[in-house]
Amino acid sequence: MQRSSACLVLEGVSRHFGGLKAVDNVNLTLQPGARHALIGPNGAGKTTLFNVISGELRADAGTITLNGADVTRLAAHQRAARGIARTFQITKLFPNLTVLENMLVACEALDRRKFTMHRPLSSCPDLVERATNLLDEFRLSPFRQELARSLSYGDQRKLEVALSMAGRPRVLLLDEPMAGLSSVERDAMQALLRKLDSSIAVLLIEHDIDVAFGFAERITVLYQGRVLTEGPKEVVSADRSVQESYLGLLVE
C-alpha cells in the first residue's frame, strides 16, 4: 500500500508487559478517508494497539507516523493536537456537565485561546457554533441542556463520538462504539458512522463481524498481538486461517 500519501503509518510497533507481547511487530497503513476495521478475539491486543497509537501507552519498538511526521515519542495530547482522536470502550464524559458544556469543553481543548472563569466558553461564538453543529449532526440537540449522566446509554455513546470529532481529526480511532447498545441504538450508531466526514481515516474495533465487514473496506485481524492477515474485506473473509482462528473457533 502506498505510504507517501498515508495519514497514519505503523512500522514494527510493539508493546510488551513483562513477558507478554500484547502488541507484536504490527504494521498498518491508513490512507485519508480509509474505513478500516481491527478485529480479533478478546485479548488479541486491539485496545492496547489503540492506546499505543493515541499515545496513552508508549511503544517499546517501532515507529508511528502521522501525516508524514514521526509522533512515536509524543504524548497523547500532542498527538491529539496533530490530528488523532479516539473513543474508549468505557464512555468517558463529564457526567455533571450538560451535553452542550461537554461539547464546548471538547471544542476548546484544541483551541489556542485561553479561557478563564471571567471568560466562559459560552462567550465564544465560534466555539458555540462548532459545538451546536456537532450536536445537530449527531442528533443530540434536543438534549443540549440535559446533564450527560441523564442521557440514555446509546446517546452517551453518540455524544462520545461527537466529542471525538470536536478537534476536526485526521484519524479517528473508535473502540467498540456499539458495545452494549440495543439493536435500535446500534442501527442508529451505524447510520451516524456512515455519515462521518469522508476525508477522515477511521479505524474501528468491533466484535460484531457483520458490523465490522459492513463498515470497513479493509480489515486487519489481530491475534495474540500479531497481525494474522490484512486486506480487502472480501479477501480476509475468505482467508482460511482467519476462519479457523477467529471467525470460527475463537469468535466471541
Where are these regions (language model features)?
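Glycine-rich phosphate-binding loops of nucleotide-dependent enzymes
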Residues: 2-252
